[in-house]
């Protein structure tokens, strides 16, 4: 009967008839021989007869094992078939001949000839190189040969069982052919060559021509000079689908620790710049409005990466369809096992169909995920580029509403989240497709019961709508609170030095912790809501199946085990997208929030483009022309910042701007730069501009890079600039001269050095117009005079120069002076003209004259007032010489980011787990998950056991009992899921909170040397990206790991219970999977680490750009900075791309192994004699096995991804382990509350360096500052003045020596006790975002009356009273809505409130005019008369009335005495310094000043 059925079915007969195999084999072998013969003839005609020697020589030099093994395999197969041919001839000669056996002999003959010809062809014609693959036709032949050999082996096994095989040698030949074919397939998928350099050519056809070879040679030569691009861009089809192009990098990762240089660049089509311009071209604007909506953002993102999205759509569709092949055939499979066979060899056909479907599913899923992640990388790249581009065009007044921390958050968190959404992009429509396919299969199995299944599914999805809305609300609030925290964190880190000097760091830490508390509140709601959604959807399959089976019972639809198992298989496949639904909903919500936030940011107004008319150099006689100009930082303010501005500046003029603090001087320069919005009037600027900001902006990088600022090196001009800016002497002190790396914001430079470097930067640009904003305030008098003479009057004598200054001695040389007051130009003219024409300038000159008179009086006065020189001030020449001879280690201050190597240690996991209740919940979570799996399997076993196999078998239990037991088991398993989800959420939340608190506490307790050596971007990276991973990603990854591991164990248990032989299959497969994981993880781990590290430069560059945007725009350097961000973007993208490619390389191989294991398990099941196993249980086992490859790949993928994500924990733990400063409070040595009462400071042999690898800055200071006296510290820029002050506050710990205040060694008391008892006005005035009140009294210790009193004393009272909100008037980030001088006065107000016994002024009045300086000095004399005041100043008038003067030179005390005594000695350095200062005020200034008197 079976034979007749086969004859009636021609397809089955055709497949099973062995005589057709030799015929097909002969045909294809003949075809191959003809093609190869044609190839040889064609090449011979082209003159390739003499190529044998060349190719053979190349072959001898081959170092690639694959190539040699391929030739050996071909030769072996040829020899084997020849031997088999002889043996078969001998056997047939002995036993007799027939037609079918003759066909086998011909097949062996032509097979031997084909393999011999291939071997000869490869040796003689195919040129091996490190870039080529085997010809495409040859590789296709090998793949077909492998498939043909596999099927032939199956048929010969069947014939052997029937004892119809001609010879057992043929069976052995088939086994060898399959093995060799598998190796050849693997070889043809490999890139040929070590190093895996980019293949610039399309794959060569089998017929190579001379022209193509010549082109190959030329292109390969060119490739040597090109950038190494990812092999993906030129990989062949089979290499693409198998990810074999990643193999060389994986191999390299096992041979060495991969560095960034080992990873190739992304393809040109995936570069940030190309994607960015595509994105920009697709981003449409509304008519008349540059408004970006979320829809337009999505549309532009789609068109940026449309190719990958469409390909992933195709693969997702193929995957979804292939998933449902097995459930569709499951009922047939169970019936087959029950003995109901429709045709002979039905089992082989079923197994083959299952196997092919799983192969297609495996291939489609891997390419689907890969393409989606590739698209995600591209989307992140364009979003980062777009946010950066917006930052380049954002005006200062817009940025005040969006701090740097918020903008960086958009880049680090929101852009990354949108990138991560690529995983879930297709899930919504796939879910619809899967439900549709599932309903078709269910209708086939359950009839009308499928409608109930659909209704239950719809009900589950409907029930998630309110939870999804809650999730969207929680997510939006979570991101908003994260922004607020990051804003405060960024501000605190940027100003950490002032926080530590004032003893405020713990107060700011508590503010950040409070903000984190708000964020944690929303995070807690978010994770628990997600846990609830997860519980509902994990319980959904059981609910849907119970509903469907219950409906069948009510509708009297008979339930057979085959149909039940088919339905369960469908539910299990449908379970995956339903399980993913909570994550999908969550990601959709999070992505929408992020898209809305980015769209809102991109909708901010750009810098006003029509406010200034830009003219090319030399096109106008006037370089700057303003007529009836009105400008305002806030265009909504009724009172403009600047009004009635009129002036014309011809080329080559020297313009000075002066005025009191807050009069609008800096705003006027900003208006010329186009930074202040124009309200009315006209502004024309002709030529290129260069700008020197009042607060120096220095990039992290080498000194040379800061000066060149993107221009090519012109050595002669470069040296002239260094000389004019007095930088040569500083460079000699730097460990690597101009190659020394400057820390972020120039943190390892003095204020004067930063100022001179940015002046050098401006000079080197050779611009037409130079704008200097108070450039001489941060340098000493001698250096200031030198800069004015060499720069403004020297190199720039033929340039247009506009400079703001408070040093009026630089005014007489100006061609035009503009005097400003209250935002108006009140006077304009030459020095002598305006001196006689108004009172505003007279007030400034009068104050300066008084200061000069005070200096003169000290020069001419006697030394009777204070002439005693302390013995402590004497430092012997021998000691100085001895200190100078001490070797000082030299090295860069800024260190490379820490990078762990090797696998993530077990201690990292241990520490992570113990952060939540000592790890007590982890075993409970595992037990609950195991219990869920047991109950879930039990419920399915129950259905398979009690339902009959066919209609003629009586059910074991009644329908109601069947459903009730199933519902009970399903409910119990659902409850376990709820418990597991809640416990996981609780654990993850606790760990995230503990990690955050510990890391931030250690960061804020770290010494300043940590912040000096660590760019802020690195810290922010951990506080944002790594913290987000710990908050949300890691808990779900650990849950997924537990779920996958327990599920796999359950599947193995189910299959092993049905047929124990299956366990034999799993042992080698699991071993192979484990080996692959170990082989993969070495490269993947380093790629993940490099990817994490590469984010920090991106964040750092972004942060630096935002802080220096005015300087960047003034130099027209936006294109260069845009190029830099694109380069950094590509650096991150290439590392991330190869990291996800490595993951897919692994997953493809694991899926392949799982598919083979699945197929072998099916072979075992169909091979077991009928009646040995229960068909229902066997079908159930297959149902579970359908998810085996998915679960196994998920397990390994989760393990690998978990290790990659644990790098975030590893990076945070690095900061938890950083050394802390000494204790804030030492109870045993706490000083009295009245300490210090006298304020006497004694310094003994003080030696200071900024790090063990850096040279000494202070080299053995010994002196005493008498209590109640005022001491001025002077010296050339970089001599160690500010370092001495930092040591006094223990910002820098002494390397040797000691400091005593009122007899107490400051090294023995707590830092808080020390710093809170001292007061300082720092060199760089700092204000924090908040209000006037919070800036003056951040600790909330004083009443409003006291604050107003302090404001009046520091000359800000009237200014604050004019503001509507008074003390609650807003202060923007870094006090950007206040002038630098006003910020300095606020710092003065702080110390007036604090009233400490010891006050340090570190260039406190550098940014104010002379009149304000005089008022400040009078205020200090009046309110700190009994205090010890130490003043560092470049203005001699600020220290000339001091009781003592300390002069430092190169870290040593040169002089220490009273000013009068030092001035008596005309040879003293101080006397010379005073003489230089007074001489810098021109005699014209003095004469003109006297006229006014």
Curated annotation (Swiss-Prot):
Which UniProt keyword terms apply here? ATP-binding, Membrane, Nucleotide-binding, Phosphoprotein, Repeat, Translocase, Transmembrane, Transmembrane helix, Transport
Main subcellular location: membrane
Q: In which tissues is it expressed?
A: Ubiquitous.
Identify the EC number(s).
Answer: 7.6.2.2
List, in alphabetical order, the Gene Ontology terms for molecular function in this entry: ABC-type xenobiotic transporter activity; ATP binding; ATP hydrolysis activity; ATPase-coupled transmembrane transporter activity
Q: Superkingdom of this entry's organism?
A: Eukaryota
Where's it found, cell-wise? Membrane
Q: So where does this one cross the membrane?
A: 21-41, 70-90, 102-122, 140-160, 165-185, 309-329, 343-360, 423-443, 448-468, 535-555, 915-935, 959-979, 1038-1055, 1059-1081, 1153-1173, 1177-1197
**Per its record, how is this protein called by name?**
ABC transporter C family member 7
Question: What is the native source organism of this protein?
Answer: Arabidopsis thaliana (Mouse-ear cress)
From the broadest rank down, the organism's phylogenetic lineage runs:
Eukaryota, Viridiplantae, Streptophyta, Embryophyta, Tracheophyta
User: Which gene is annotated as encoding this protein in its UniProt record?
Assistant: ABCC7
């Amino acid at each position: 009967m079976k034979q007749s059925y086969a004859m009636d079915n021609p397809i089955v007969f055709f497949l099973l008839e062995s005589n057709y195999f030799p015929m097909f084999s002969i045909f294809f072998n003949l075809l191959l021989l003809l093609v190869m013969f044609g190839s040889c003839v064609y090449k011979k005609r082209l003159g390739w007869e003499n190529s044998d020697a060349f190719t053979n020589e190349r072959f001898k030099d081959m170092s690639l094992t694959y190539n040699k093994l391929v030739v050996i395999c071909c030769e072996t197969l040829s020899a084997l078939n020849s031997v088999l041919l002889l043996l078969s001839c001998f056997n047939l000669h002995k036993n007799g001949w027939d037609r079918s056996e003759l066909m086998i002999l011909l097949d062996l003959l032509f097979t031997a000839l084909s393999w011999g010809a291939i071997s000869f062809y490869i040796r003689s014609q195919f040129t091996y190189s490190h870039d080529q693959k085997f010809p495409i036709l040859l590789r296709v032949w090998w793949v077909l040969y492998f498939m043909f050999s596999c099927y032939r082996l199956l048929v010969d096994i069947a014939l052997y069982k029937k004892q119809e095989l001609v010879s057992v040698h043929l069976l052995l030949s088939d086994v060898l052919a399959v093995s060799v074919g598998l190796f050849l397939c693997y070889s043809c998928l490999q890139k040929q060559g070590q190093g895996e350099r980019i293949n610039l050519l399309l794959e060569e056809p089998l017929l190579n021509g001379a022209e193509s070879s010549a082109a190959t040679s030329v292109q390969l030569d060119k490739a040597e000079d090109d950038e190494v691009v990812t092999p993906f861009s030129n990989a062949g089809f089979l290499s693409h689908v198998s990810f074999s192009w990643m193999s060389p990098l994986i191999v390299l990762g096992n041979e060495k620790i991969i560095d960034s240089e080992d990873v190739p660049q992304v393809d040109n089509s995936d570069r940030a710049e190309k994607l960015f311009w595509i994105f920009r071209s697709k981003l449409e604007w509304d008519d008349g409005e540059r408004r970006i909506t979320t829809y337009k953002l999505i549309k532009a993102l789609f068109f940026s990466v449309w190719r990958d999205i469409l390909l992933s759509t195709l693969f997702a569709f193929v995957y979804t369809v292939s998933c449902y092949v097995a459930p569709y055939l499951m009922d047939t499979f169970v019936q087959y096992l029950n003995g109901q066979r429709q045709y002979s060899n039905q089992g082989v056909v079923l197994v083959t169909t299952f196997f092919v479907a799983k192969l297609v599913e495996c291939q489609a899923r891997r390419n689907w995920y890969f393409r989606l992640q590739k698209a995600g990388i591209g989307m992140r790249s364009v979003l980062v580029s777009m946010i950066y581009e917006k930052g380049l065009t954002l005006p200062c007044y817009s940025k005040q509403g969006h701090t740097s921390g918020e903008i960086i958050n958009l880049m680090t968190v929101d852009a990354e989240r949108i990138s991560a959404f690529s995983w879930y992009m297709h899930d919504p429509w796939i879910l619809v497709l899967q439900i549709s396919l599932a309903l078709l299969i269910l209708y086939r199995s359950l009839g009308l019961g499928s409608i109930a299944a659909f209704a239950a599914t719809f009900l589950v999805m409907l029930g998630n709508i309110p939870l999804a809305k809650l999730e969207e609300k929680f997510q939006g609030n979570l991101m908003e609170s994260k922004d607020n925290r990051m804003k405060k964190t960024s501000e605190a880190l940027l100003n950490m030095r002032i926080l530590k000097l004032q003893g405020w760091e713990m107060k700011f830490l508590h503010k950040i912790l409070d903000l984190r508390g708000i964020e944690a509140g929303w995070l807690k709601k978010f994770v628990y809501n997600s846990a609830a959604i997860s519980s509902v959807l994990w319980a959904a399959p059981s609910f849907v199946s119970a509903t469907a089976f219950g409906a069948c019972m009510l509708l009297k639809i008979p339930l057979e085990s085959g149909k039940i198992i088919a339905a369960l298989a469908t539910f299990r496949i449908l379970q995956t997208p339903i399980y993913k639904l909570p994550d999908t909903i969550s990601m959709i919500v999070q992505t929408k929030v992020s898209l809305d936030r980015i769209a809102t940011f991109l909708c901010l107004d750009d810098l006003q483009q029509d406010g200034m008319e830009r003219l090319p150099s030399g096109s106008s006689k006037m370089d700057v022309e303003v007529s009836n100009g009105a400008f305002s930082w806030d265009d909504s303010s009724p009172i403009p910042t600047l009004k009635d501005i009129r002036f014309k500046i011809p080329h080559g003029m020297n313009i000075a701007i002066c005025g009191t603090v807050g009069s609008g001087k800096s705003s006027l320069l900003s208006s010329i730069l186009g930074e202040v919005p124009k309200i009315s009037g006209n502004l024309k600027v002709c030529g290129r501009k260069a700008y020197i900001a009042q607060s120096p902006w220095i990039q992290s990088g080498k000194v040379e890079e800061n000066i060149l600022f993107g221009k090519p090196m012109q050595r002669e001009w470069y040296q002239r600039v260094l000389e004019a800016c007095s930088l040569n002497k500083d460079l000699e002190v730097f460990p690597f001269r101009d190659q020394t790396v400057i820390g972020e914001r120039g943190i390892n430079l003095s204020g004067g050095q930063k100022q001179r470097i940015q002046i050098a930067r401006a000079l080197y640009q050779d611009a037409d117009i130079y704008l200097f904003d108070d450039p001489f305030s941060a340098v000493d008098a001698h250096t200031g005079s030198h800069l004015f003479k060499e720069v403004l009057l020297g190199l720039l004598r033929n340039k247009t120069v506009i400079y703001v200054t408070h040093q009026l001695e630089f005014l007489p040389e100006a061609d035009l002076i503009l005097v400003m007051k209250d935002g108006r130009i009140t006077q304009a003219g030459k020095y002598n003209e305006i001196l006689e024409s108004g009172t505003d300038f007279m007030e400034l000159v009068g104050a300066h004259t008084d200061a000069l008179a005070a200096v003169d009086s000290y020069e001419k006065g006697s030394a009777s007032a204070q002439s005693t020189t302390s013995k402590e001030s004497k430092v012997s020449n021998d000691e100085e010489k001895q200190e100078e001879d001490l070797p000082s280690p030299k090295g860069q201050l800024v260190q490379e980011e820490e990078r762990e190597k090797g696998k993530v240690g077990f201690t990292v996991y241990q520490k992570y787990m113990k952060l939540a209740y000592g790890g007590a919940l982890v075993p409970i979570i595992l037990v609950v998950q195991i219990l869920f799996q047991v109950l879930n399997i039990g419920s399915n076993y129950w259905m398979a056991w009690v339902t009959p196999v066919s209609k003629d078998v009586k059910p074991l239990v009644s329908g109601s009992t069947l459903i009730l037991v199933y519902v009970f088991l399903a409910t119990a398993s659902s409850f376990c899921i709820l418990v597991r989800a809640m416990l996981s959420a609780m654990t993850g939340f606790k760990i995230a909170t503990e990690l955050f608190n510990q890391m931030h506490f250690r960061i804020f307790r770290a010494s300043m040397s940590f912040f000096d050596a660590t760019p802020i971007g690195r810290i922010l990276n951990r506080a944002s990206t790594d913290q987000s991973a710990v908050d949300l990603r890691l808990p779900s990854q650990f849950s997924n790991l537990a779920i996958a591991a327990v599920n796999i164990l359950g599947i193995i248990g189910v299959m092993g219970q049905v047929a124990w032989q299956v366990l034999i299959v799993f042992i080698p497969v699991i071993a192979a999977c484990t080996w692959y994981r170990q082989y993969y993880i070495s490269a993947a781990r380093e790629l993940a680490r490099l990817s994490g590290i590469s984010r920090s430069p991106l964040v750092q560059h972004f942060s630096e750009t935002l802080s220096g945007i005015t300087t960047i725009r003034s130099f027209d350097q936006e294109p260069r900075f845009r190029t830099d961000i694109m380069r950094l973007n590509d650096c991150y993208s290439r590392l991330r791309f190869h990291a996800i490619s490595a993951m897919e390389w692994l997953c493809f191989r694991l899926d392949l192994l799982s598919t083979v294991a699945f197929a072998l398990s099916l072979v075992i099941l169909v091979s077991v004699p009928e009646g040995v196993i229960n068909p229902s249980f066997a079908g159930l086992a297959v149902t579970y096995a359908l998810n085996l490859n998915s679960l196994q790949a998920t397990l390994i993928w989760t393990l690998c991804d978990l290790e990659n994500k644990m790098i975030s924990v590893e990076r945070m733990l690095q900061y938890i382990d950083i050394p802390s400063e000494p204790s804030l409070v030492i109870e045993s040595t706490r000083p009295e509350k009245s300490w210090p009462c006298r304020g006497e400071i004694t310094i003994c042999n003080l030696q200071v360096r900024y790090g063990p690898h850096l040279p000494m800055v202070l080299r053995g200071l010994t002196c005493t500052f008498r209590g109640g006296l005022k001491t001025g510290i002077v010296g050339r820029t970089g001599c160690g003045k500010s370092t001495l002050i930092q040591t006094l506050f223990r910002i820098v710990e002494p390397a040797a020596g000691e400091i005593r205040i009122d007899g107490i060694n400051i090294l023995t008391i707590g830092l808080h006790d020390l710093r809170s008892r001292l007061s300082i006005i720092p060199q760089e005035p700092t204000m924090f975002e908040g209000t006037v009140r919070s800036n003056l009294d951040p600790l909330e210790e004083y009443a409003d009356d006291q604050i107003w009193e302090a404001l009046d004393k520091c000359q800000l009272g009237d200014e604050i009273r004019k503001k509507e909100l008074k003390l609650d008037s807003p202060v923007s980030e870094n006090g950007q809505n206040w002038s630098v001088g006003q910020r300095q006065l606020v710092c003065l107000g702080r110390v007036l409130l604090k009233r400490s016994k010891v006050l340090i002024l570190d260039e406190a009045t550098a940014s104010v005019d002379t009149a304000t300086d005089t008022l400040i000095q009078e205020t200090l004399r009046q309110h700190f008369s009994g205090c010890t005041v130490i003043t560092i100043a470049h203005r001699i008038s600020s220290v000339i009335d001091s009781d003592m003067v300390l002069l430092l030179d190169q870290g040593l005390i040169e002089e220490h005495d009273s000013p009068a005594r030092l001035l008596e000695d005309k040879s003293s350095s101080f006397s010379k310094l005073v003489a230089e200062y007074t001489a810098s005020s021109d005699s014209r200034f003095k004469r003109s000043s006297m006229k006014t008197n």
